[in-house]
Swiss-Prot record:
Residues 425-585 form the OTU domain. It comes from Xenopus laevis. The RanBP2-type zinc fingers, also called NZFs, mediate the interaction with ubiquitin and determine linkage specificity. RanBP2-type zinc fingers 1 and 2 (also named NZF1 and NZF2) specifically recognize and bind 'Lys-29'- and 'Lys-33'-linked ubiquitin. RanBP2-type zinc finger 3 (also named NZF3) binds 'Lys-33'-linked ubiquitin and shows weak binding to 'Lys-6'-, 'Lys-48'- and 'Lys-63'-linked ubiquitin chains but it does not interact with 'Lys-29'-linked chains. ANK repeats lie at residues 253-283, 306-333. It holds the Pfam family Zn_ribbon_RanBP. One of its GO terms (cellular component) is cytoplasm. GO terms for molecular function: cysteine-type deubiquitinase activity; K63-linked polyubiquitin modification-dependent protein binding; zinc ion binding. This is Ubiquitin thioesterase zranb1-A. InterPro entries: AnkUBD, OTU_Deubiquitinase, OTU_dom, Znf_RanBP2, Znf_RanBP2_sf, ZRANB1_OTU. Zn(2+) 3 binds at C150, C153, C164, C167. It is found in: Cytoplasm; Nucleus. GO terms for biological process: cell migration; cytoskeleton organization; positive regulation of Wnt signaling pathway; protein deubiquitination involved in ubiquitin-dependent protein catabolic process; protein K29-linked deubiquitination; protein K33-linked deubiquitination; protein K63-linked deubiquitination; regulation of cell morphogenesis.
Length: 701
């Protein structure tokens, strides 16, 4: 027999290994299980063929031996003795209980079927199952369970390998637990059967063929069990980690998620996430816990004890740091009517949803059926000054009020309107996210937020169903606006369509910022004009001018018939990417209102005069006018008078009259405001009593 015939070839790398090797020298792949050794490999003298034939029926190497076969018998090499897998048709060795390729269970053979014998001159194999061959199959099954297949190059690696030895692909985390369980179960069954057969087989065998001491076998099997237990243990640890993370997530509340989103937003530069957490009433000084750091799973960015301020300093977010430090220094809990009365607020939201209808016809735009205008109650003036200050701190946005009044004379710049005509405007506080425009519109009408995105849905559906109408107005207006600034250019229709598709997409995304076109559509949904008082320039947090805002002006529902719309407008304020509702306070209605103010002698009606000119007495722009509607200032003033109840005050200011009535207002809104105001009335007596006592003491002195 030649040397090439004695060696066995590896089925993975084809390397020729020595017969005593149990693994491939090159790739460490296990030796394929086949026939058993039929001669003593360590004899000094070479046996003849006759002795081989005499000893073929009684193998010399028992299950406890670590040696591997040298010469394969004719029985094991006969192809017809193999069984075909019913799943993948692979030919497996007769002793295999599972398919080598797909690990599917061997089909149970019927009593009529019998394996074909080779019919050669060799003696037939005895009917009892050979413990050595049984051991080979079991060993192969264990080895199969100790390996994992690389998903990139399909190479089988050892279980303890962290990455593929061929392509360095990492070990997959999702190990097949079913395969490991089946392998372990099958191995335990074979072990029990093997031990029972080994007791019977070894008792009747010759003393010269007795196996070596079992310490070698036990050590090998212990090593295999350790490898398999390590693989199972690592999977158990992975499952425990997943279970722990799931428990942490189940304990998380909405505020916790907003806090984590704010932390990630600082790292990634997302200001909206920080503002969402801030407006929800979250604690700016909150620190990251160990569970939260584990859930974020970014040790390089997050650490236990970090706050939003720490993260802003670490990642050099100067703009976010300015907002956070301002919030820490001026932290005041907000208390608006919608927060105090959640039950009434939900009923109002249902009323709004029920009042949304779609107009039949060519212009199938959605609209609201009710005319509601929110005003602050006049009873606030009856509260003590300290209580009034507390109320205004909790319901108003002081930063917006200061920017619109002091930094730029945008609102309340006329003493005539603010004092004598009681038309002072107040900026209500709302969420500083992308929904601020929709929130401010509902606050100016119903006094609540667009929490359920009812108004956003109506906005998106109106833009989608009436896309042709709004698209024509938008395209014509954008072209004229660019030319008015001396920008003479033309866009392809594909570019116009892309920009319009972006505007449509913003309307469908909750939290997305909205543009001038969306205000124009909202004016049609409300069926009333919208006046926006805003800053003229975009500015950075350092005060640097970045560009024009283009939001200030009047938005008329030009695509409706005038008879279908109301002439009482609402007012919004715009400051640095944020919209706020501008509302007035109720008045008694019997003061001298100036020239042109007709109150119909109804004391219950509150009239607020909204200026249609800026502080320089220039007429506000009317957005989205067509070429036929564009004209000089007199023509635009005429158009404003057609769509709104306008008058000129004694000071010569052109104003639009916003009329509201507590008696005609929606009863749910009235109940909500009264319940909110009762909370401040309850703290009035103590303060009033102490002030009265001090006044009496002063008089006595």
């Amino acid at each position: 027999m030649t040397e090439h015939g004695i060696k066995w070839g590896c089925e993975y790398c084809t390397y020729e290994n020595w017969p005593s090797a149990i693994k491939c020298t090159m790739c460490r792949a296990p030796r394929p299980s086949g026939a058993i050794i039929t001669e003593e490999p360590f004899k000094n003298s070479t046996p003849d063929v006759g002795s081989m034939e005499r000893d073929i029926g009684s193998p010399l190497i028992c299950p406890d031996s670590s040696a591997r076969p040298r010469v394969k018998s004719s029985y094991s090499m006969e192809p017809s003795s193999k069984w075909s897998c019913q799943i993948c048709t692979y030919l497996n060795w007769p002793r295999a209980i599972r398919c080598t390729q797909c690990l599917s269970q061997r089909r149970t053979r019927s009593p009529t079927e019998s394996p074909q014998s080779s019919g050669s001159g060799l003696r037939s194999i005895p009917s009892p199952i050979d413990p050595c061959e049984e051991y080979n199959d079991r060993n192969k099954l264990n080895i199969k369970g100790q390996h994992w297949t690389c998903s990139a190059c399909t190479y089988e690696n050892c279980a303890k390998a962290k990455k593929c030895v061929v392509c360095d692909h990492p070990t997959p985390n999702n190990m097949d637990a079913i395969e490991l369980a089946n392998t372990d179960e099958a191995s335990s069954i074979i072990n029990e059967q093997d031990r029972a057969r080994w007791r019977g087989g070894c008792s009747s065998s010759n003393s010269q063929r007795r196996s070596p001491p079992t310490s070698k076998r036990d050590s090998d099997m212990d090593f295999q069990r350790i490898e398999l237990a390590g693989a199972v243990g690592s999977k158990e640890e992975f499952e425990l980690d997943l279970k722990k993370l799931k428990q942490i997530k189940n304990r998380m509340r909405k505020t916790d998620w907003l806090f984590l989103n704010a932390c990630v937003g600082i790292v990634e530069g997302d200001l909206s996430a920080v503002e969402s957490y801030k407006t929800s009433g979250g604690d700016i000084a909150r620190q990251l816990s160990a569970d939260e750091v584990r859930l974020l799973n970014r040790p390089s960015a997050f650490d236990v004890g970090y706050t939003l301020v720490h993260l802003s300093i670490r990642f050099q977010r100067q703009d976010m740091l300015a907002i956070l430090l301002t919030e820490v220094s001026q932290h005041a809990a907000k208390c608006i009517p919608a927060m105090v009365c959640p039950e009434l607020t939900e009923q109002i939201r249902r009323e709004i949803a029920a009042s949304v209808h779609q107009r039949k016809g060519d212009f199938a735009c959605y609209f609201l059926t009710d005319l509601v205008t929110f005003t602050l109650p006049a009873d606030i003036e009856d509260l003590p000054p300290t209580v009034q200050e507390k109320l205004f701190d909790e319901v108003l946005d002081r930063d917006v009020q200061k920017e619109l009044e002091e930094e730029s004379p945008i609102i309340n710049w006329s003493l005539e309107l603010g004092t004598r005509l009681d038309s002072r405007l107040y900026a209500l506080w709302n969420r500083t996210a992308g929904d601020c425009l929709l929130d401010s519109v509902l606050q100016a009408t119903w006094g609540i937020y667009d929490k359920d995105s009812v108004l956003r849905k109506a906005l998106h559906d109106s833009l989608h169903d009436c896309s042709h109408w709004f698209y024509s107005r938008w395209k014509e207006w954008e072209s004229w606006y660019s030319q008015s600034f001396g920008l003479h250019f033309s866009l392809r229709e594909e570019q116009w369509q892309e920009d319009w598709a972006f505007i449509l997409s913003l309307a469908s995304q909750p939290g997305a910022s909205l543009e001038q076109t969306h205000i124009f559509v909202l004016a049609h949904i409300l069926r009333r004009p919208i006046i926006v008082y805003g800053v003229k320039y975009y500015k950075s947090f350092r005060g640097e001018t970045l560009g024009y805002t283009r939001f200030q002006g009047v938005y008329l529902p030009l695509l409706w018939e005038q008879s279908f719309c109301w002439k009482s407008p609402i007012a919004l304020g715009y400051t640095r990417g944020h919209f706020s509702a501008l509302v007035a306070m109720e008045n008694d209605g019997f003061d001298n209102r100036g020239a042109g103010a007709n109150l119909n002698t109804d004391d219950d009606i509150t009239v607020t005069f909204l200026p249609l000119v800026d502080s320089e007495r220039k007429l506000l722009h009317i957005h989205f006018l067509s070429a036929q509607e564009l004209g000089n200032e007199d023509q635009q003033e005429k158009l404003l008078r057609e769509w709104m109840d306008c008058c000129v005050t004694e000071g010569g200011v052109l104003v639009a009259m916003q009329k509201s009535s507590r008696r005609r207002n929606h009863p749910l809104v009235t109940q909500m405001v009264e319940k909110w105001l009762d909370g401040y009335r309850q703290i009035r007596p103590c303060t009033a009593l102490s002030d009265g006592e001090e006044d009496e003491d002063d008089e006595d002195e």
